[in-house]
Each structure stands twice: as structure tokens, then as C-alpha cells.
């Protein structure tokens, strides 16, 4: 895998600024002597996630507010509210707003934490587009992809209505994003058994009515606060610019948290090229120093007892305790795996860990039942064909299965209740020709006569068999978009730009912020293997930063 795959998913932990509400503080105590933080620094700042009322306002466990839509629906591109979407749009030709270098628009609120930068920070559908340079790249990629498709639709149809062009381009982009996610990203992450067990890959051709209206597709706590944070172990200490002709310049990742300067003056193109070819960090229990000790390091001294930087691993474990998720062993059983009764790696113990990883867990926890999900899952030995151990594979496959089978607007649906809302067979053929390498090739500018080349399977290294570098002209096959816009344009003209539901009412969006303030997934989980088993909440009170890496 490459850094492109490591950054396809976004960071899910964000830094809390200067605290305004002490009742929400859940600081992490630092024992001294600490191998990194200087004497006198006794706590690491941590703010709890905002609580939300239980379903129907009944009494129950504390739940957390999720302000994002619970589907692969491009909310990081378009936002999760109408107000944010309006700010992100250009109001001409169905396009999204860009800055003068075809990058993300300026964030009028400035940079997070009051950071002073040479260039302005960015605004996107997600609040973290400037968090790291490698996270900014996919934001810019899909912004440009939307505008490219909107322009192509305008030329092919002659339609000038901004709303029609925007919604149609958005519809195509979301379908392509879903296709790339389930047919390139997840196969690079999970083994064949997990992909097949949860029916994650799309059909090679045609429609697929996988929608199940009895499923609750919202994000389970274990996925958001532990399993999907597995990408943090793939982060490297450096980011880079590949300027072509063997000219590569590298930078410390810790120097560019929420600093967008590397994206300007063709920096996006240089960074995208570097990400496609550089190796990622190994998927294991270790985090690099740039995010374990120097995350969001500040040159400004905070309170006397507070650290000037953060430890992402510690924050992830504390976030799991903030949400009150059960321990590692509970999720082993949830996934049909055997619980660990002792720390040895023999049957009955930590059978999916190396002796070194098991010993590190034993030094940190008193009993296997005390192991936090993030620590236990991240330290598992990857299974063959995957970069993850069985527990995180199970949870990620389970959640993405819910996202797919619980999505009424999944791109492969036939929509028997309203066929106008579905893609035609001809349109699906074009969507299923989408690859991430085509998306990337379509949006990059050629700089100084240097033409881009990428491997066809962009999320995998070019050194693997049948994945050697190819020119973008060959990848796109002479079509700037990488697919034929004609079927979409022809149908849009036939519908006269109107895509209405059967009763003349537009289909609603997937649930947005207003809905999610009232509804949230439960914190008890039903096993996909044993539907009758239920695992309740288990809470912890505090967290001591481990002296050793686990």
C-alpha cells in the first residue's frame, strides 16, 4: 500500500482548543518520569465528545453527537448541512468554489488554533481539510473531479441551470466515490474472506438491489473511536514533494499540522505524485514520533501542567473510554473469535498477537479483559491478504456492510419505487469503469512539460506484479474524464433536467445533522455471527499514559 491508501480515510480525532467548558475535560494524566514530556507536565488536554439525548429521550447510557452523515455519500466534499453546502458552491455552472490555484476555497474563520501561515487555510465539507498535507490531497482531488464533471455536463447538454448541473455532477461523483471505496480501498485493507462475508464488493456489471430497510446504518462507536483509527499506524514521519525527474523534497509531518503551505505553487501535484509512490509505514502497534509525541505541537506555552503537544495513541484510547466502549475481549467475542484468558500466545491466550506484542500488553494491563479495543486490535498480527488483524477486519467489514446495505441511495440500486432515481445500465457501465488512478489523472495539471504517470491500482505499490507505472494518457485512454459522459447527458436532456420522485417530491438526502441530533446508534452491539448475543457498555474512569509503546 501507499500513503494514498493511508489517507483515503480521514483522521477521526481532532484537537480540542483552549477549554471553555471544564465539565467536558477528561484530561490524561502523565506519570513522571515520562520518556518525552518534560518534568512538571502532568496532564494532556482532552475534551469529551458532546453528548446527545437517547432515542425518544428515554433514560439510558450517554451517547455522542455525530454531525456527519452515516453513509459514503461525499459529505466531506459537499458538507452535511444545506448551509455549509451553500458556502462551498460557486453558484455558476454547477461548480464547487475554488481558489485562484484550483484548490479548496479559503476558510473565512482562519486557521485552527490561531496558527499564522503563509497561505490561507482551506474550507471543505469536513472541518479537517488542512489537518495534514496528505489529508488535503483527496479533498482537492474530489473537488476538482466534481468541477470537471459539471463542466462536461454543461458542454454536452447545453444546460446552464446551476442547481441541475450541481446535483447531477454530485450524483455521479458520489457513485464514483462509492465504487472506488468498495472496489479499491477496502480490498487493499481487508482480506478476501472479509470482503465476501460482508458482501462488500460491487457486482462486475449491472444493478444490485442490496438495500435492506431493516438495517441501522449509523456508525457504531467501536468503528469510530477504535477500528477505523487503524490508519494512524500507517502515517510516516515525513511528507514529500515529488517534482519529477528524481527530484524529491521531504518535510517533517509535525511541522505542517494545519499548515496548508505545501499545497500552493503546484504543491498539490507534487504531493499527489509523492503519495502514489512512497511507501507507507508498516501496519503494527507502533506510531511514529510525529503523531505520538509531537501531534499539534505548539510554540506557545500552555498552562504550567499541560503538555505543548499531544499523543495520538493516548487520545485514541481515551476516546474509547470517553464513549464507554467495551474492552477488546468483548469485540473478539462479538466477531466470533475466542476471548483471551491470559497473556500468552498459546490457545486460550492472545493467539493473534506476536510474543512481543503480548508482552507489551501484559506490562500495561492487569488482565486481558482490561485491554482497550484500540490497543488490542492495533497490535494484532495482520492476516494474510490484509494489513489488519481479525478483530479490526471484522469491525471495519461489518460497518462498511451497514453503510452499503443500509443506504437507500446506493449507486447500484434499481429503485423499484421510482426508476428515474436509478442509474441506467449504460450509466452504470461508465461508473464501474472508474478507478482512483483515472480520478487522479483527470484532475492533475501537467507542470513544466512533465506528464504524470501512475500505477493502475493507485492504492497499491507500483512494484507489485501488473501494477507498473503508466502514463495518464494511457490510463485515461484519451478521455479526459476516464469515462463517457454521453449516457448521463442524454438522459438528463430526456428528463429535461428534472429528477423527481414518484409523487413529484424530491428524494430526501441521507440523514443530516438535524436528524442525527435525535438518533444515534446504540452502545450495545449485536454480533453478526451470533445475533442473539448482546454486549453491554463497560466504562472506565481515567487513563495513564503508558511508559512503553504498545
Each PLM stretch: what is its role?
Residues 132-144:
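Alpha-helical bundle segments that constitute or directly flank the non-heme di-iron/ferroxidase center
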Residues 1-133, 150-541, 545-550:
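Terminal regions of secretory-pathway proteins
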Residues 146-148:
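Secondary-structure-rich domain cores
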Amino acid at each position: 500500500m501507499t500513503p494514498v491508501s493511508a489517507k483515503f480515510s480521514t483522521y477521526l480525532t481532532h484537537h480540542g482548543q483552549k477549554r471553555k467548558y471544564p465539565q467536558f475535560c477528561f484530561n490524561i494524566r502523565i506519570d513522571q518520569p515520562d520518556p518525552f514530556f518534560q518534568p512538571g507536565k502532568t496532564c494532556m488536554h482532552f475534551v469529551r465528545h458532546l453528548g446527545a439525548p437517547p432515542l425518544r429521550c428515554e433514560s439510558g447510557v450517554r451517547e455522542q453527537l455525530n454531525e456527519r452523515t452515516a453513509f459514503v455519500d461525499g459529505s466531506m466534499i459537499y458538507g452535511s448541512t444545506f448551509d455549509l453546502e451553500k458556502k462551498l458552491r460557486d453558484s455558476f455552472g454547477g461548480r464547487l468554489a475554488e481558489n485562484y490555484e484550483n484548490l479548496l476555497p479559503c476558510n473565512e474563520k482562519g486557521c485552527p488554533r490561531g496558527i499564522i501561515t503563509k497561505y490561507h487555510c482551506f474550507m471543505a465539507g469536513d472541518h479537517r481539510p488542512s489537518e495534514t498535507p496528505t489529508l488535503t490531497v483527496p479533498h482537492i482531488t474530489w473537488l476538482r473531479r466534481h468541477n470537471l464533471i459539471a463542466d462536461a455536463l454543461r458542454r454536452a447538454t447545453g444546460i446552464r441551470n446551476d442547481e441541475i448541473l450541481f446535483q447531477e455532477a454530485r450524483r455521479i461523483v458520489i457513485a464514483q466515490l462509492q465504487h472506488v471505496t468498495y472496489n479499491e480501498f477496502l480490498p487493499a485493507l481487508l482480506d478476501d474472506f472479509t470482503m465476501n462475508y460482508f458482501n462488500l464488493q460491487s457486482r462486475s456489471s449491472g444493478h444490485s438491489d442490496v438495500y435492506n430497510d431493516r438495517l441501522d446504518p449509523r456508525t457504531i462507536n467501536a468503528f469510530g473511536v477504535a477500528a477505523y483509527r487503524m490508519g494512524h499506524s500507517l502515517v510516516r514521519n515525513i511528507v514529500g514533494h515529488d517534482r519529477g525527474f528524481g527530484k524529491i523534497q521531504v518535510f517533517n509531518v509535525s511541522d505542517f499540522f494545519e499548515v496548508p503551505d505545501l499545497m500552493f505553487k503546484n504543491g498539490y501535484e507534487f504531493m499527489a505524485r509523492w503519495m502514489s509512490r512512497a511507501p507507507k509505514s508498516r501496519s503494527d502497534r507502533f506510531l511514529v514520533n510525529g503523531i505520538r509525541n509531537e501531534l499539534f505541537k505548539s510554540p506557545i506555552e500552555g498552562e504550567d501542567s499541560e503538555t505543548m503537544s499531544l499523543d495520538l495513541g493516548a487520545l485514541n484510547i481515551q476516546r474509547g473510554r470517553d464513549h464507554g466502549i467495551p474492552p477488546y475481549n468483548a469485540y473478539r467475542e462479538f466477531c466470533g473469535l475466542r476471548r483471551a484468558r491470559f497473556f500468552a500466545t498459546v490457545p486460550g491466550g492472545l493467539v493473534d498477537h506476536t510474543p512481543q506484542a503480548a508482552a507489551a500488553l501484559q506490562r500495561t494491563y492487569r488482565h486481558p479483559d482490561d485491554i482497550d479495543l484500540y490497543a488490542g486490535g492495533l497490535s494484532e498480527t495482520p492476516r494474510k491478504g490484509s494489513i489488519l488483524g481479525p478483530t479490526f477486519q471484522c469491525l471495519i467489514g461489518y460497518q462498511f456492510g451497514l453503510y452499503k446495505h443500509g443506504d437507500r441511495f446506493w449507486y447500484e440500486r434499481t429503485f423499484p419505487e421510482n426508476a428515474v432515481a436509478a442509474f441506467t445500465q449504460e450509466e452504470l457501465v461508465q461508473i464501474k469503469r472508474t478507478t482512483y488512478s483515472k480520478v487522479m489523472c483527470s484532475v492533475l495539471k501537467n507542470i513544466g512539460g512533465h506528464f504524470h504517470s501512475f500505477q493502475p491500482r493507485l492504492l497499491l505499490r507500483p512494484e507489485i506484479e501488473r501494477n507498473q507505472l503508466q502514463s495518464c494518457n494511457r490510463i485515461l485512454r484519451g478521455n479526459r474524464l476516464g469515462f463517457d459522459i454521453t449516457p448521463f447527458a442524454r438522459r438528463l436532456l430526456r428528463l429535461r433536467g428534472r429528477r423527481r420522485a414518484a409523487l413529484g417530491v424530491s428524494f430526501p438526502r441521507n440523514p443530516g445533522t438535524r436528524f442525527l441530533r435525535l438518533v444515534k446508534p446504540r452502545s450495545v452491539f449485536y454480533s453478526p455471527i451470533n445475533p442473539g448475543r448482546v454486549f453491554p457498555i463497560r466504562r472506565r474512569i481515567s487513563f495513564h499514559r503508558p511508559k512503553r509503546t504498545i
